[in-house]
Amino acid sequence: MATSAKLMLGSGLCQKLSQLTRQIHMQPALMSSFRSSREVQELDKYPEVEVVANPPEWRFVERLLPAKTVPQPVEKPKYPSGWQPQKEDGSELGYHVARTKNHMVPVYLHTRFRGQRRITVVRRVQGDIWTLEKDLRAVVEQSRNGKVCATRINELSGQIHFHGDHVDVLRDYLKEKGF
């Protein structure tokens, strides 16, 4: 294949290409940006720089930087998105569902087996998980017109699994309760 390519290009052009490739491969360090950069000059030739510990313009830069933690939400009577802040710890009920670090209700939908199996998961449950499961199962069965809903409880990790897609129903119920 190489000999047929040489015949097609012609002998003069082939020689020029081989010389060019030899030059490139023989001197890779000369073509780097380090070698081609200018040498360091005396400090007098560089412009003066004033180092300021707290410049007044820094507040504009701080607004652009992301916050290290999620800020506490501003108290309002009603939020336009429908979000509600978490109320008290729910000690009178015997259980508590803690919000996530982004102040969201921890109800998730897991899809398995190419979307055929849908499982709703309630996480971050503290306290009497069995009572919460009974209350949530009653809400889900009421939304399903009395059909039985299979549940699974993981007491150690504080999770309740519901068979089916019940994210909206459970999230609305937990928001009503103040979690």
UniProtKB/Swiss-Prot annotation:
Annotated GO CC locations: mitochondrial large ribosomal subunit
BP GO annotations: mitochondrial translation
Keyword terms: Mitochondrion, Ribonucleoprotein, Ribosomal protein
InterPro entries according to UniProt: Ribosomal_mL49, SUI1
Residue ranges of the TM segments: none
GO molecular function, one term: structural constituent of ribosome
Pfam families the UniProt entry points to: Img2
Principal location listed in the UniProt entry: mitochondrion
Domain of life: Eukaryota
Compartments where located: Mitochondrion
Quaternary state and interactors: Component of the mitochondrial ribosome large subunit (39S) which comprises a 16S rRNA and about 50 distinct proteins.
Family statement drawn from the similarity comment of this UniProt entry: Belongs to the mitochondrion-specific ribosomal protein mL49 family.
UniProt-recorded name of the protein: Large ribosomal subunit protein mL49
Species this chain originates from: Drosophila melanogaster
